[in-house]
Structure formats: structure tokens, C-alpha cells
């Protein structure tokens, strides 16, 4: 999961499969390691007895929650995966940036392909290591109110996985 306080996603969290508590993840690299293995190994925090690091508040005006697809590969060495939230706070744009000495931002797989063809140090990198799949925003999903009930209901876990 990604936590957004600004237009750039720079905070990361994961939910423990055992205790279901949300844990802050130290760095983007650590988060990508967890995310790349989610289909073969679920995240386990090893601190289940302790309180969670944060609570997912979907009604917050200052924080938005986004969820990545499972098993997106780790970003290749020499590149950085950049996630930018659009101004409407609903969708995320994914970019890759080359690191020093000159930063260059890539908006498509075609641009990345051209870049790795031109750079000797990236000759071992494959395009399967790059994913422009954007995280989806998590939000409460309200069920339609029937004529016999005036309360608003949510899905069982309160989270909509739909975009």
C-alpha cells in the first residue's frame, strides 16, 4: 500500500497477513522487495503483539491510500520508480527515472526500451523488470441504500478494491 500526503507517493505501508495491522515500511526499496514477492510469500510483520503503526482512514482529507498490484518486480538498479498522484487524487501516473549523472524521466515502456538499448550499463536489464501498472486508490464502497434501511453500509472489510 502507498500512503499519500503530497502529490508524490513517498510513504509506504504493508498489511500483515497474520494480525492484519498496517506497518510502515522504511524505504521504497524495502517496500518493492515485499511487493515483488506477495504472490509467493505474504508480508508478516513479526510484531503482531504491538499496536499497528497507522490506521487506514479513508475519509481523511490529507491522506490517500493506494494499493499496488501484486508481484510488480523490483525496480532495476540504476532506475527509480516514481508515482505521482494526479490533482484529482483519484489516479496515479507511473514514471521511471534514470539516476545520476543525468536524470531522465520515462513515461512509457517504449522510452525505457530505447534508453536501455543506448546504455551499455543496462544491457542485462529486461523490459519484464519494468511495470507501468498504477496503484489503485482504496476507498470506502457504499452500498445502495434500500427503502427499508437508512443506514449506509460498506463491504465486509470496508474497502473497495475497485477503481
UniProtKB/Swiss-Prot annotation:
A zinc finger (CW-type) spans 6-56. It comes from Arabidopsis thaliana (Mouse-ear cress). Probable transcriptional regulator. PANTHER family: METHYL-CPG BINDING PROTEIN, MBD (PTHR12396), METHYL-CPG-BINDING DOMAIN-CONTAINING PROTEIN 1-RELATED (PTHR12396:SF10). This is Methyl-CpG-binding domain-containing protein 3. SUPFAM superfamilies: DNA-binding domain. The methyl-CpG-binding domain (MBD) functions both in binding to methylated DNA and in protein interactions. The gene is MBD3. InterPro entries: DNA-bd_dom_sf, Methyl_CpG_DNA-bd. Keywords: DNA-binding, Metal-binding, Nucleus, Transcription, Transcription regulation, Zinc, Zinc-finger. Residues 153-163 have a biased composition (Basic and acidic residues).
Amino acid at each position: 500500500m502507498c500512503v499519500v500526503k503530497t502529490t508524490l507517493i513517498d510513504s509506504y505501508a504493508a498489511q500483515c497477513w497474520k494480525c492484519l495491522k498496517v506497518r510502515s515500511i522504511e524505504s521504497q526499496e524495502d517496500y518493492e522487495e515485499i511487493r515483488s514477492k506477495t504472490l509467493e510469500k505474504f508480508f508478516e510483520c513479526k510484531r503482531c503483539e504491538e499496536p499497528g503503526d497507522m490506521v487506514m482512514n479513508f475519509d481523511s482529507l490529507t491522506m490517500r491510500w493506494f494499493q499496488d498490484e501484486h508481484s510488480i518486480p523490483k525496480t532495476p538498479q540504476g532506475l527509480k520508480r516514481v508515482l505521482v498522484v494526479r490533482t484529482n487524487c483519484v489516479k496515479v501516473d507511473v514514471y521511471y527515472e534514470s539516476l545520476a549523472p543525468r536524470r531522465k524521466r520515462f513515461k512509457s515502456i517504449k522510452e525505457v526500451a530505447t534508453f536501455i538499448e543506448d546504455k551499455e550499463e543496462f544491457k542485462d536489464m529486461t523490459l519484464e523488470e519494468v511495470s507501468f501498472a498504477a496503484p489503485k486508490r482504496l476507498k470506502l464502497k457504499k452500498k445502495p441504500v434500500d427503502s427499508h434501511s437508512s443506514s449506509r453500509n460498506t463491504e465486509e472489510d470496508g474497502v473497495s478494491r475497485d477503481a
